Amino acid sequence: MAGGYQHCITAIQETAGGVLSDDDLEEIVGDVQRRARRYTRENPLEGNEAAALRAAKEVTDEQRKAALIEKRSRAINVLRKQQNLAYVTAHFGDAESKGLQALLVGVEGREQGAAISQDSQAKGIATGFLGPLVNELRQHGVLGMLLESNLLRAGQLVGLFKGRVAQFKQLEREIAQELWNITDPEGAIDTHNAKAKEIARIFHKYQDLARVQQNEAGAWIGKIPGYIVRQSHDQVKIRGRGEAADFIRWRDAILPKLHEKTFDDVPDGKREEFLEAVWTALSSGVHEHAQGDWLGGFKGPGNLAKKLSSERVLHFKDAMSWFDYNEQYGHGSLLESAISGFMAAGRNIAALRTWGTNPEAAFERLRSEMVDRANKRRDFKEVDRLRGDKL
């Protein structure tokens, strides 16, 4: 096994240009070891040496991909900055604050592109996914049952239509299973429900389109086996009173449902600490990373591409584990969760197209340049506007 690890370390050092610290290397070796142990548990016939080599290759490939992502990210961010600087200068001149506002939410006026903001783009992109999705569901005669299922969930809160609610919950279970089957054929369980298969096919078609468009805008989103829809977390249900007993209740509910790969990056003996950190994040609503949908790399604060491209923190064992957790601690129906995913994709694409892979940092850099420019011409009112809370 040591040989497999050394090969991994050498390859990663070459990829990183020799800038990895001893702590970085120790973390990488720990990652390889944890994965190798999981592979051995999952397939005892594979053998320790083969499992170690497989884990080492996987980690090496991920590190190489991360280096490519960083290079691509820098190029995209330079281009976005040039575009935004040229746009504000050409169309708003010395009214830089108005130009920044136009980029974010749009402004009234006759300036070219005054209404083409990040906000309006996000809504238009999401509509571009949802309109064709709804039309295709209608054409295949399955839209009505999804809408009825969604409406009856509201009735469930007051005890109405319990029989129909149970029927539609079963339909949603089968849709979830068929979505899982599409991305994880090896773990597929056939529901023998033609309607569920058709709905899953249509959902997956537009989810993959959203994934591809996010990649084109600057993300690096791969496919994860077993992806169903955007995971929701109801922080009120998860948090309870915010006491230790509430964490234990959540932990005991989710732990049997999680796949072992959830803990690949968790040091030995730190599982409880890891789960408590996830619970705290979900309870406070700070859970972007915990519900990130797909794979990737990146480092850096506020990096949207990192959030989009990061591997999910919570991996479920199977479709029913995902569904049962979503019923207990998520919110909304499967349809609502899917719609939420498309709305999020619209926001992500608009932000990436406007600002690049790190929108917050890109905005602050551009604003800082605008402040310097206004200061040089001693336009202190414009400086105040640029530094104001409205931006």
Question: Predicted regions: what is each one?
Answer:
Residues 1-391:
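Structural preference for well-ordered, secondary-structure-rich domains
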